[in-house]
Swiss-Prot record:
Keywords recorded for this protein, A-Z: Carbohydrate metabolism, Isomerase, NADP
Family under the similarity heading: Belongs to the NAD(P)-dependent epimerase/dehydratase family. HldD subfamily.
Full protein name: ADP-L-glycero-D-manno-heptose-6-epimerase
Gene symbol of the encoding locus: hldD
Subunit structure as annotated in this protein's UniProt entry: Homopentamer.
Length: 310
């Protein structure tokens, strides 16, 4: 059995899909479906069982055996960069992750987990997986950074696989439940389909991010499980492309609309990553050599998925 925490969420459900595509269906999804809309991410997928996150954590902390576990993909976390409840964030992202990590270490179960480019904070260059480059801007980034630091202490003595992925700006299918935290491509598509002018912040041609397609993210996760390699790795494309490029690809697909530029909100000033670009040196040195989709390629594929029933 393979466990996917956050399996009804954005990246987790795409990992479930990638496993299904390889014929793997013996999957336990762990999630919190209090926000009931997330179930739609699983309706076209095949899993063996579902467990609520709280029940799962109780079993993990009690040391209860959950059966023959091949691997754990730990994608479950609070991923809101605008959540400022530090206790909630540390309990949810740090303590929970530590409990699950030790459960896996004691049983030599491969543990693949979601870290984040938010660990780098407001850098404009050198997004490198090393302490001197890490300075998170928000409590979400700090919770991810602290767990990475914890993993670094354990890695030299670990007898089983531990691998963390610093996700950059992931976009693609199955993110609709994220609301305001969904990608720009998702929001632009919604605005166009509602007959509105798609909106970007003023200066969006200067805001550049490493936008990585979620299908590529799932592929990297599965490749590492097969390779057995450990470490903490950036997971982006290695390219910085502008929000304007995302909009251009969206408009090109729809063949209509023009962008309305809106003022940059004061509340985001100083807390907003204006530039991200993954350094892929370590990922490539680990042996992962597949190409990553460009914004034009990924957004086009995503638009086709979003509008498949249109």
């Amino acid at each position: 059995m393979i466990i996917v925490t956050g399996g009804a969420g954005f990246i987790g459900s795409n990992i479930v899909k990638a496993l299904n595509d390889k014929g793997i269906t013996d999957i336990l999804v762990v999630d919190n479906l209090k926000e009931g809309t997330k179930f739609v991410n699983l309706v076209d997928l095949n899993i063996a069982d579902y467990m609520d996150k709280e029940d799962f954590l109780i079993q993990i902390m009690s040391g209860e055996e959950l059966g023959d576990i091949e691997a754990v993909f730990h994608e479950g976390a609070c991923s809101s960069t605008t959540e400022w409840d530090g206790k909630y964030m540390m309990d949810n992202n740090y303590q929970y992750s530590k409990e699950l990590l030790h459960y896996c270490l004691e049983r030599e179960i491969p543990f693949l987990y979601a870290s984040s480019a938010a660990t780098y904070g407001g850098r404009t260059s050198d997004f490198i997986e090393s302490r001197e480059y890490e300075k998170p801007l928000n409590v979400y980034g700090y919770s991810k950074f602290l767990f990475d630091e914890y993993v670094r202490q354990i890695l030299p003595e670990a007898n089983s696989q531990i691998v963390g992925f610093r996700y950059f700006n992931v976009y693609g299918p199955r993110e609709g439940h994220k609301g305001s935290m969904a990608s720009v491509a998702f929001h632009l598509n919604t605005q166009l389909n509602n007959g509105e002018s798609p909106k970007l912040f003023e200066g969006s041609e200067n805001f550049k991010r490493d936008f990585v397609y979620v299908g590529d993210v799932a592929d990297v996760n599965l490749w590492f499980l097969e390779s057995g390699k450990s470490g903490i790795f950036n997971l982006g494309t290695g390219r910085a492309e502008s929000f304007q490029a995302v909009a251009d690809a969206t408009l090109a697909y729809h063949k209509k609309g023009s962008i309305e530029y809106i003022p940059f909100p004061d509340k985001l000033k100083g807390r907003y990553q204006a530039f991200t670009q993954a350094d892929l040196t370590n990922l490539r040195n680990a042996g992962y050599d597949k190409p990553f989709k460009t914004v034009a390629e990924g957004v086009t594929e995503y638009m086709a998925w979003l509008n498949r029933d249109a």
